[in-house]
A protein has these predicted regions:
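Acidic, Mg2+-coordinating catalytic module of metal-dependent nucleases/exonucleases
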Residues: 98-105, 110, 114-115, 145-205
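A ubiquitous structural signal for well-ordered alpha-helices
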Residues: 86-89, 175, 227
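Acidic two-metal-ion nuclease catalytic site recognized across multiple nuclease folds
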Residues: 177-240
């Protein structure tokens, strides 16, 4: 089974208000195992970059109202292709595979808006699997952001200083496999027991309040002692 773990970065929250996609990142899974195949592209949104969005992902310093050269980790967009140049290639990559997305409704509305403006086929909503919904169902009332799930599953996200579509997809792939129990399943053992930490040394049987009475009769005990005495030096427990 092929799945595509996907993320986008945008200029804002609403494509119908003129916001656009500026980055797409995706990771391919086969039978819940990463293949190493990825899709990654930066996109010129053909508009300015709001300061708020830039603060999230650091993409497009050359499109700010006060344009400037990029600093470390920032990516310029004026020299990148517009969506019309990459849309078909994106569809060719995902094909009809299930799309694993965190907060899928957000990314899907942007992807389908961009595809609609190009006159390309829309992606059916049921092709997307929302890991945010899965997390909220599994852990009701708990934080379900990508960062929160990384903390829950002890997934290293120290490189995630700014949002980035490909990095977030790689992290989400690990989170997704944890959510479905597919990453190093422990057959119901706790994490500490499975890793060897907090194992048998931490477990102690509870003392029985009333000791059990022996069910061996006096005759049986005498017969056993006579049998042991008869074995003498041939007993296994006397051998070196």
């Amino acid at each position: 089974m092929r799945e595509i773990v996907l993320d986008t970065e945008t200029t804002g929250f609403d494509p119908e208000s003129g916001d656009r996609i500026v980055e797409i990142g995706a990771v391919e899974l086969w039978n819940h195992v990463a293949t190493g195949e990825t899709y990654h592209v930066y996109i010129n949104p053909e508009r300015s970059m709001p300061d708020e969005a830039f603060g999230v992902h650091g993409i497009g310093p050359d499109l700010l109202d006060n344009p400037r050269p990029p600093e470390k980790g920032e990516v310029t967009l004026k020299d990148k292709p517009v969506f019309a140049k990459v849309g078909q290639g994106f569809l060719d990559f995902i094909q009809d595979s299930k799309l694993v997305i965190h907060n899928a409704s957000f990314d899907m509305k942007f992807l389908n808006a961009e595809l609609r403006w190009m006159g390309l086929p829309q992606i059916p909503m049921d092709q997307a699997l929302d890991t945010l919904a899965i997390a909220r169902k599994r852990f009701p009332g708990s934080p379900a952001s990508l960062d929160a799930l990384c903390r829950r599953f002890n997934i290293d996200n120290t490189n995630r200083v700014l949002h980035g579509a490909l990095l977030d997809s790689e992290i989400l792939a690990e989170v997704y496999l944890e959510l479905i129990g597919g990453r190093q399943p422990d057959f119901g053992l706790s994490t500490s027991a499975a890793s060897g930490a907090g194992g048998q040394d931490d477990w102690r049987p509870t003392a029985r309040p009333t000791p059990l009475a022996s069910k061996i009769t006096d005759e049986e005990r005498a017969a056993h002692e006579a049998f042991v005495e008869k074995l003498g030096e041939n007993a296994l427990w006397t051998r070196a």
